[in-house]
From Swiss-Prot:
A cellular-component GO term for this protein: cytoplasm
Cofactor: pyridoxal 5'-phosphate
Catalytic activity: (1S,2R)-1-C-(indol-3-yl)glycerol 3-phosphate + L-serine = D-glyceraldehyde 3-phosphate + L-tryptophan + H2O
Described purpose of this protein according to its UniProt entry: The beta subunit is responsible for the synthesis of L-tryptophan from indole and L-serine.
Keyword Amino-acid biosynthesis: yes
Enzyme class name: lyase
Keywords from the UniProt entry: Amino-acid biosynthesis, Aromatic amino acid biosynthesis, Lyase, Pyridoxal phosphate, Tryptophan biosynthesis
Keyword Translocase found: no
PROSITE patterns for the chain: TRP_SYNTHASE_BETA
Protein name: Tryptophan synthase beta chain
Length: 399
């Protein structure tokens, strides 16, 4: 692969990415790109971002050796990158802080966001309150039912939560509504996209704000083990936690990178959210990437036990990493994720998010095939408090 320097000036990762949006949004995206590039060159902006990540988010978080789990599985040593310990309980806050600082720098008084599991909505509401901005979060009706505690948290933090009743009433539809809002209110409003999808410059901007995950993990692994990890594993919905972990390792060819999509009820059932594993290239939400679509190019409905993975597309950089073979993409089913959720609870005393449990499920498959002197880093992208009611209901327990 040589030196990795993507995206290009037009936001392309090979044939993926780009800026497929209404003409009315082009000036806003160009303004955003200029502001972001200026901020990246500004030592004061970088210093404030670093300070906020330390003092407000609580970084660096640990790279934790799951010793009991590793012994029980046999094979590779499993290390967990503890994004669940961040303020607000997931990786999402890294990007929300970065984009909110950028919004403030651009003089925007109102921020909007889309959310699936609610974690990005909570993170955006949190930073909007911190920096004194009005906040509106779009969320699909089905996700509002699945993640009612996060909806209440957003409202506690002062955000307005708007239910989206169109389409599948999930993340895809929330994103559509947020884009419509932005087109209408582009002068006053900053759209805080929560994943590495969307039109350029969002995929590169969100990646850069999340690369702190991989930068920390790389240094921590060298400190703890004296060498780089053999394998990185992260769940992939839109793909922000995964690209945050993977990006600093892309040129380290000996390090395997594996993204785990939502296998739902099984890849053969059509009831899943695995565009990289089963989909094909197309255009959605302003960028070209792998999608779940039918023969006519219509987006197919998705299913996952996890609201945060329930999305028919994926970030364009993941599409490129798949095609070049630098990263591998697999799927874990609802059932496998639930089993992994329980196993981590009972071996390490950590309750993971159902999204993260998909990554754990694949790590549990892979570790026994490796040697005990090899290491796997799993990105524990979030904590599972938000999923307690979902898991209890599936097991017939009424909370």
């Amino acid at each position: 692969m040589g030196t990795y320097a993507l995206p290009d000036a037009f936001g392309h990762y090979g044939p993926y990415g780009g800026r497929f949006v209404a003409e009315t949004l082009i000036p806003a995206l160009e303004e955003l790109e200029r502001a972001y590039q200026e901020a990246q060159r500004d030592p004061e902006f970088r210093a404030e971002l670093h300070s906020e990540l330390r003092q407000f988010v609580g970084r660096p978080n640990p790279l934790y050796h799951a010793g009991r789990l590793s012994r029980e599985l046999g094979g590779a040593q499993i290390y967990l990158k503890r994004e669940d310990l961040n303020h607000t309980g997931a990786h999402k806050i890294n990007n929300a802080v970065g984009q909110a600082l950028l919004a403030r720098r651009m003089g925007k008084k109102r921020v909007i966001a889309e959310t699936g599991a609610g974690q990005h909505g909570v993170a955006t509401a949190t930073v909007a309150t911190r920096y004194g901005m009005e906040c509106l979060v779009y969320m699909g009706e089905e996700d509002i039912q699945r993640q009612s505690s996060n909806v209440f948290r957003m409202r506690l933090l002062g955000a307005q939560v708007t239910a989206v009743s169109s389409g599948t009433r999930t993340l895809k539809d929330a994103l559509n509504e947020a884009l419509r809002d932005w087109v209408t209110n582009v002068e006053s409003t900053f759209y805080v996209i929560g994943t590495v999808a969307g039109p350029h410059p969002y995929p590169v901007m969100v990646r850069d704000f999340h690369r702190v995950i991989g930068d920390e993990a790389r240094a921590q692994c060298l400190e703890l083990t004296g060498r780089l990890p053999d394998c990185l594993i992260a769940c992939v919905g839109g793909g922000s936690n995964a690209i945050g972990l993977f990006y600093p390792f892309i040129e380290d060819r000996a390090v395997r990178m594996i993204g785990v999509e939502a296998g739902g009820l099984g890849l053969g059932t059509g009831q899943h959210a695995a565009p990289l594993t089963t989909g094909r290239p197309g255009v959605l939400h302003g960028n070209r990437t792998y999608l779940m679509e039918d023969e006519d190019g219509q987006i197919l409905p998705t299913h996952s036990i996890s609201a945060g993975l329930d999305y028919p597309g994926v970030g364009p950089e993941h599409a490129y990493l798949k095609d070049t073979g630098r990263a591998e993409y697999v799927a874990a089913t609802d059932e496998e994720a639930l089993a992994a959720f329980h196993r981590l609870c009972r071996t390490e005393g950590i309750i993971p998010a159902l999204e993260s449990a998909h990554a754990l499920a694949h790590a549990f498959r892979l570790a026994p095939t490796m040697r005990s002197d090899q290491t796997i880093i799993v990105n524990l992208s979030g904590r599972g408090d938000k999923d307690i009611h979902t898991v209890a209901a599936l097991e017939g327990i009424h909370l």
